[in-house]
Amino acid sequence: MKRVRFAPSPTGYLHLGNARTALFNYLFSRHENATFILRIEDTDLERSKKEYEEMLMEDLKWMGIEWDEGPDAGGPHGPYRQSERLEIYMKYVDKLLKSGDAYYCYCTEEELEQEREKAIAEGRPYRYSGKCRNLTPEERAFYEGKSIKPVIRFKVPDKTVVFEDIIRGHVEIDTKEFGDFVIVRQDGMPVYNFVVVIDDALMGITHVIRGEDHLSNTPKQIVIYEALGFAIPQFAHLPIILGEDRTKLSKRHGAVSVRALKDDGFISEAVFNYLSLLGWHPKEEKEILSKEEIIKQFRIEDVNKSPAIFDRTKLRWMNGVYIREILDLDDLTKRAIPFFEGFGYKADYEFYKKVMSAIRDSIETLMEIKERAKVFFVDEFPYTEEIVNEVKSDENVYKVVEIFYNKIKNLSAITKEDFKNITKEIQKEYGYKGKALFHPIRIALTGEPSGVGLDLLVEVIGIERVKFRLERFLEYFG
């Protein structure tokens, strides 16, 4: 049985790079009928926070990513938080110490700094000298007597580590490049490269799918697998995600967390769809794909090794397609209501639904509701200096609004058809047409030079509010 995992640290919001890693693990698991595990890497006790863990899970679920085993779901390989697994890790540390594959290192920070400076002066990469590698019992006793808190280092064998990466192909790294590395810090906390091996081995992980920034960690982890006699999983290192300027994706590229995209009014299915295309592409030339279509076509072997480019304009376009064409109106309205309410636009469900029907073709994110929907909710809007000057300089503007008002003032309701018929009457009787007819009505009803169709607007807001806006305009400029 194939088993994969996503193992984030709860030290902040879910970054889009990590979300893409979670997504590709999820897609692999569903395509391969494998088990998907969520594991929380919270050994950084200072930075890890419970609220970040909760938000992380919320954001994954919002995206449509579900897991089979995890802190909330349970499972046969728990606990699924590293902070709850310390006893397990120390058992394997003891095993390595007893087998001679690990040792206590008493070197001070000053000594290590001198080693680093010497390496720099000699123009070579730094690796630990191995000073404490073969201490005698007497030497150890001497250091213990000085109350020096040791770290524990892994005794790295002198060899070339070779593995076949599913995405990157053949990889060879000489262990001379990194030397004996720390597996337990002075405070007694085991480090990432050690605990990740123990967790992956005991949880039966068969495929490790993660970002290429972990590529340099892989040989260190492989030598630990070998020392403990664990089966080595297959590795797949995903390409880095860059901004449009070809630098590493960061806050200066705008919203780069799932939470920020959600708050900015992006649709979860659009985010799922877009992130799936960062480094992978279906065989067919089609970009709008349902979750089921993506799962069916996704193969980890097809992931590209060159960097993926995060194109916000394309994400907005794709989000707009979901708003305009894919979500049904009721579903879209339910998702939009928190945005309406957040902007102070209060109404009942049916009114929200009518507004969404009117504006969905002109927005790319739900955040744009603030501006696009304003004309449906705000009756007392300011007249800009431009409008004031226009009305003063062209008497026809006021005249057209007055004619239109006289045509509708006795109506008890108004529909799109009524609006079209009335404007046709005005054209016929007074000769006003095109911009000369519709522009004055628009600025009287909205205070804007362009926007939503006027026939739609009058039908949605209703006759009383149409009269109120026209009367307000006529009184202001009369």
Swiss-Prot record:
UniProt-listed SUPFAM superfamilies: An anticodon-binding domain of class I aminoacyl-tRNA synthetases, Nucleotidylyl transferase
Residue span of motif 'HIGH' region: 8-18
Primary site of residence: cytoplasm
Broad EC category: ligase
Cited InterPro entries: aa-tRNA-synth_I_cd-bd, aa-tRNA-synth_I_codon-bd_sub2, aa-tRNA-synth_I_CS, aa_tRNA-synth_I_cd-bd_sf, Glu-tRNA-ligase_bac/mito, Glu-tRNA-synth_I_codon-bd_sub1, Glu/Gln-tRNA-synth, Glu/Gln-tRNA-synth_Ib_cat-dom
Residue ranges annotated as motif 'KMSKS' region: 248-252
Reaction catalyzed: tRNA(Glu) + L-glutamate + ATP = L-glutamyl-tRNA(Glu) + AMP + diphosphate
Enzyme Commission numbers on file: 6.1.1.17
Pfam families assigned to the protein according to its UniProt record, in alphabetical order: Anticodon_2 (PF19269), tRNA-synt_1c (PF00749)
PROSITE patterns: AA_TRNA_LIGASE_I (PS00178)
Compartment list: Cytoplasm
GO terms of molecular function: ATP binding; glutamate-tRNA ligase activity; tRNA binding; zinc ion binding
Residue numbers binding ATP: K251
Gene Ontology biological process terms in this record: glutamyl-tRNA aminoacylation
Domain of life: Bacteria
UniProt GO cellular component terms: cytosol
CDD domains: GluRS_core
Complex formation: Monomer.
Family indicated by similarity: Belongs to the class-I aminoacyl-tRNA synthetase family. Glutamate--tRNA ligase type 1 subfamily.
Described function: Catalyzes the attachment of glutamate to tRNA(Glu) in a two-step reaction: glutamate is first activated by ATP to form Glu-AMP and then transferred to the acceptor end of tRNA(Glu).
Name assigned to this protein: Glutamate--tRNA ligase
Organism (species): Sulfurihydrogenibium sp. (strain YO3AOP1)
Higher taxonomy: Bacteria, Pseudomonadati, Aquificota, Aquificia, Aquificales
Gene expressing this chain: gltX
